A protein has these predicted regions:
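Catalytic cores of secreted/periplasmic lytic hydrolases that degrade extracellular macromolecules
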Residues: 1-176
């Protein structure tokens, strides 16, 4: 039986397993679908989602304790009209880690999160170089360009992200 086109695959709304291998396995189908449309390799998105959530251990929760489905730590800026989740997070201000309260985007599914991330990277001129490096397949170059463009405030972000991307890639290869 085929799903109606409006039905979401189950992995897009069920809680993601905690831990790298289960996390990657659970979200690979979603990442592959979005990669086909966006040109951003699935392993890059899985690695970034894994890094941002501690491989599913620390997902952003909504005020009522529900899942925000925000795998990428995307903030809800002035232009965001969707749902939000407000949490305390660590931001690096002048190189010093500080706890701040910030609003993050909230989604209806993990697929929505992947699609919004891909849209952010492909549509925002700030990430033009990152998008170009994604096509080369270099996790190190992609992570470096995201950091240069200001995706995160952590001064070690590129190093941590490229490690997470390569880790996701190893899991994907082992599961293939």
């Amino acid at each position: 039986a085929t799903l109606p086109s409006t039905a979401m695959p189950v992995e897009t709304t069920t809680q993601v397993p905690k831990g790298r291998d289960g996390f990657v396995q659970h979200l690979s189908g979603t990442a592959e679908r979005v990669a086909q449309e966006s040109g951003i390799p699935a392993s890059f998105m899985l690695g970034q989602a894994g890094h941002e959530t501690g491989w599913g251990k620390s997902e952003i929760k909504t005020a009522n304790g529900g899942n925000s489905f925000n795998l990428f730590g995307i903030k809800a800026g002035k232009g965001w009209t969707g749902k939000v989740a407000e949490i305390t997070t660590t931001e690096y201000i002048n190189g010093t880690p500080r706890k701040v309260v910030a609003k993050f985007r909230a989604y209806d599914s993990y697929e929505d999160s992947f699609r919004d991330y891909a849209k952010l990277i492909t549509d925002n001129p700030r990430y033009e170089k990152a998008q170009a490096t994604a096509k080369t397949g270099s996790a190190v170059a992609y992570a470096a360009e995201l950091q240069k463009a200001g995706y995160a405030t952590d001064p070690e972000y590129a190093k941590k992200l490229s490690g997470a991307i390569n880790s996701a890639l190893r899991v994907q290869r082992a599961q293939a």
